[in-house]
Swiss-Prot record:
Domain of life: Bacteria
Any one annotated GO CC term: plasma membrane
InterPro entries, per database record: SLAC1/Mae1/Ssu1/TehA (IPR004695), TehA (IPR039264), TehA/Mae1 (IPR011552), Tellurite_res_ion_channel (IPR052951), Voltage-dep_anion_channel_sf (IPR038665)
Subcellular location: Cell inner membrane
Record field: transmembrane: 22-42, 50-73, 94-112, 116-141, 154-174, 177-204, 209-232, 239-262, 269-289, 295-321
Family indicated by similarity: Belongs to the tellurite-resistance/dicarboxylate transporter (TDT) family.
Effect of G29D: Blocks channel. Abolishes ion flux
Positions in the Cytoplasmic compartment: 1-21, 74-93, 142-153, 205-208, 263-268, 322-328
Protein name as annotated: Tellurite resistance protein TehA homolog
Pfam families xref list: SLAC1 (PF03595)
Amino acid sequence: MLHFAHIFQNKVHTMNITKPFPLPTGYFGIPLGLAALSLAWFHLENLFPAARMVSDVLGIVASAVWILFILMYAYKLRYYFEEVRAEYHSPVRFSFIALIPITTMLVGDILYRWNPLIAEVLIWIGTIGQLLFSTLRVSELWQGGVFEQKSTHPSFYLPAVAANFTSASSLALLGYHDLGYLFFGAGMIAWIIFEPVLLQHLRISSLEPQFRATMGIVLAPAFVCVSAYLSINHGEVDTLAKILWGYGFLQLFFLLRLFPWIVEKGLNIGLWAFSFGLASMANSATAFYHGNVLQGVSIFAFVFSNVMIGLLVLMTIYKLTKGQFFLK
């Protein structure tokens, strides 16, 4: 028996040398988008009886995919540790690791309707996890020498911006609204500081084709920000919410114009980078609709977001059936 275990470990070691782990960390964008869309549908429960069923189905699928990916990442930590280490120290790819605590919090948000205790545990794990990761990894960049202008990619929004906004929303769900404001402030200031740096980089140099799908992350900050804000202020659509929504739509128009350039080399799973922004657009649209504010725009935003994420799902299924989903 030990002989077979030794052979298996040697085989795994050989595989590590010859091929990458089949699941990139960026693929956590799939349960991210599905979970956020589930929450958007949940907020329509009092308007459409079927909305709860749609939300539950999306939530169950998102949670199942998240569990699968977490197990695969645990396997990666065990047998592909050098690849994990390289990703952590990469000036670009390290940001995608933040998707793990972000999705953990969103799955906690979904589970809250069924099991508040487990949900709260997941939300706190995600909140503490993202804060520790940002503290350890992002602070290293302040030491200099490890970050260059070309390292400025949209994925850099994830650790300090998206993660803090998600913490704000999740903590508000648990009733910690004041604490949520702290994370909201952290995310908003981080966004304001990083946004001009990224836009300046995009103006003076082009993203490589393999990184262009990450442009979808640019859609997220404004819509995730307004969703977090509406969570902690009890859903009141005030002037700030309208301002944030307006900026989100401006980014949407820019990205629609750039989309042919983004997919110049073909469709790929990386396009799920758009999903968090799209789902947060739908989520905030429900609050605008409930508040009788820009109801026509909110209906369009909700329908558009669902159609776009539906197309991402169809693309993913196609890639799976063609054997093009996992890295080889």
